[in-house]
Amino acid sequence: MESKIYKMELAGRELSFEIGKYALLANGAVLARYGDTAVLVTACASEKPREGINFFPLTVDYEERLYSVGKIPGGFIKREGKPSEKAILSARLIDRPIRPLFPKDFYHDVSVIATVLSVDPDNPPDVLAMLGSSVALSISDIPFEGPTGSVLVGYVDDKIVINPTAKEREVSKLHLVVSGTKDRVMMIEAGAKEVSEDIMLEAIMRAQEEIKKIVEFIEGIVREVGKPKMEYQKRIVPEDIKQKVREIAYDKVYQYVQIPDKIERDKKLDELKEEVFKAFEGETEETLLLVDDALYSLEKEIVRKMIAEEGKRPDGRKFDEIRPLYAEIGILPRTHGSALFKRGYTQVLTVATLGTKGEMQFLDGLEEEEAKRYMHHYNFPPFSTGESKPVRGPGRREIGHGALAERALEPVIPSEDEFPYTIRLVSEVLTSNGSTSQASVCGSTLALMDAGVPIKAPVAGISIGLITKDDGSFILLTDIQGIEDFFGDMDFKVAGTREGITAIQLDIKIHGLTKEIIEKALYQAREARLKILDFMQTVIDKPRSELSPYAPKIFKTTVDPEKIRDIIGPGGKMINKIIAETNVKIDIEPDGRIFVAAPDDISGNRAISMIEGIGREIEVGQFFLGKVTRTASYGAFVEIYPGKEGLVHISQLDERRLKSVDEVVKVGDLVLVKVIGIDKLGRLSLSRKEALNVTYSRKAK
């Protein structure tokens, strides 16, 4: 094929797709450019279907190349390793809008690989990779019912902005990625600073307008260079198998799916599956796969028909009803904050840990190096679904759900000036029956409040499901459980405060959503969210006023940046002396802010006093927390900061007359003293007696 470049304008910048020049053996390949960002996207499919499976084997990889931003990988091995968390999240962004657009009976392995070649900060490569994947699949011979378009949406100065620049993204109240076909929305991923439902809907529909232009542009490319779609062997269940499965299972499935209790319901359905397979004993593996397909289709048909035509949900709830809620806080005594949140069978334990500034996570990827002081991790162990299998590291799903919960709470996390701690949340899914990510949002809010983190507002999350009918009408289901998620058309996760939305994640199994569905889902989610927030505030209505006694105590001071060198000392001598004497951790910022993490108030105040004393002009009347270094018959010598001592005469040690210095102090004691005199040689006269009634507390709030 002859190389050709197709161009269009998008948000005032040129978007181009170059086809026929790169990756010539791939089924479809395109070099996508937007500004100075360039991503090569390829799509390949196996020649034959994979044997013995009943799922679509699609894999999507997002390959970050550090040369794209002029960097050499750090560490001993100077090449890229396993995908970063950002790369995994980007791969999920590409996957989710395209997966529903492949034929349901297509079992060939399909691989989509997006390789980032050049990055312009104003034009994020992940959204460009989404566009490239749509083009690569659409022009290939792989069966794909696209194309799709994707855009990033911001909300800056009360205006919706399509594909905002890096500066605009910094001040935007919204980070929204929307993907869709010409007339329907396929995927939504959003983080927001308490944005209203009206603004969110407007932003989504504004995105859809741009997506329509992109899709029409790609359709034009496909008409010119698109390959004919490959013929593939369709796996069709014969009517006799369908009929036999129906005769055995219909009445029992209808009865069992209405059992409210998940454990009992799953047990009965598993027994029924064994009964059905027993009726086909001796058949080939291929036939048994068809039997499995027939049983799945029957269960799906019955559950959807029961909801759509009879108005019944499997557990008997109304369409807008939330499962029973339960929550408990402070259940792990040695952690800094903990909460158990339950919604029906779904059960999540979240633990909050407070750390020092030095425990922040440093990210060095395609973007500028970034320090993360708040993070959320989500674990989904096999026992949560009652399965017996090895425990592996976090998969893409865990990373995606953790990022969603992290994004949901980020707008309410206090600033570093308000709360100078690093915050880590870990959500352990103990029992899964749908909507575990949103349960982790609720549990995280409670754990933060239990830990005494002054969050700006509580956050709750809910999942809305969808059942569409043949006539185009639809039913929305609040708080979907596992069986409704499995057989339904949508999982629309919405998290937020009473004021607005903080995060959205939409996954669908059909060919897109209309404006009407999205609008109703947003408002139904809001109604449920407010009910959950009401419940959560009966458990704890505001953050605890005090931190856990096991949390580090953070003290903060600010010094002249020019004094930092003196505080560190030659070869770190001075700062190491402070650390050794007070048993603290010290983090120094270039702007002069100094954070001290201490095991107790005395150590923290002592360290702050020592730091502030270095290079400071001492004046009569100032107070210091010092350490007794030696004693004599006439008084005690007190070091008020490293290298600076003063004498507390025996007459200044106490209000009463003393016979011996040892009656009040001994070497190693910390004492609060006041400077009462400085002689011509700079020697200090100190008084403990005048400082006795002074409360010394410099603990950072």
UniProtKB/Swiss-Prot annotation:
GO biological process: mRNA catabolic process; RNA processing
Protein name per UniProt: Polyribonucleotide nucleotidyltransferase
Function: Involved in mRNA degradation. Catalyzes the phosphorolysis of single-stranded polyribonucleotides processively in the 3'- to 5'-direction.
Cofactor: Mg(2+)
Chain ranges of the KH domain: 552-611
EC number, UniProt record: 2.7.7.8
Protein location: Cytoplasm
Organism per entry: Caldicellulosiruptor bescii (strain ATCC BAA-1888 / DSM 6725 / KCTC 15123 / Z-1320) (Anaerocellum thermophilum)
Domain of life: Bacteria
Alphabetically ordered keywords of this record: Cytoplasm, Magnesium, Metal-binding, Nucleotidyltransferase, RNA-binding, Transferase
GO MF annotations, alphabetized: 3'-5'-RNA exonuclease activity; magnesium ion binding; polyribonucleotide nucleotidyltransferase activity; RNA binding
